[in-house]
Amino acid sequence: MFKDNSKIINFIVDWLNDYCVQNSVEGFVVGVSGGIDSALTSTLCSMTKKPVLCIQMPIHQSKNEITRSTNHIKWLEKNFTNVISVEDNLSSVYDEFVKSKNNTSSSLTYSDEKKQLAFANTRSRLRMINLYFHATSNNYIVAGTGNKVEDFGVGFYTKYGDGGVDISPVSYTHLTLPTIAEVDRYGGT
């Protein structure tokens, strides 16, 4: 469909702008994790010139992940006047939830493996709740960070978690690492 990635980038930015106009929303909320997909998504949303709220939501994240997301957000705020950010550390909320489930006296029994999966999915769902709190409060939409393989290939996302978004700017394309470098020429990651 496109001969070079700059056309894909421009197409996505135009599509994001059109989506906002057609749906009477004012901007975007993006969860920035420190990964490539959230860096790409937040940069593309920033390129629309519409307000973008970048949110860090650590739940016992590694220092490296937090540093990467912080550095990317700082770069966005320096290069795009439409970007603001907030850090909502959800570790204590998650810990309280885990504690309540571990202390529940019940006749129900859970396998450790399934319980750990449920706790992992809970992290994603807590983040989704937080993203939508901010989006609804500002008349913004949640821009998902899932890529094509995650969203349409292997279906690697948590239902009602990181799969619970309004729009997925990078899920319909084959954007890859070289494309990230091209976006970097526009504004960087």
Name the predicted role of every residue range.
Residues I36, A181-V183:
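Intrinsic disorder/low-complexity signal
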Residues G155-V170:
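A mobile, often basic/glycine-rich helix-loop segment
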Residues T173-T179:
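Conserved small/polar residues in nucleotide/adenosyl-binding loops
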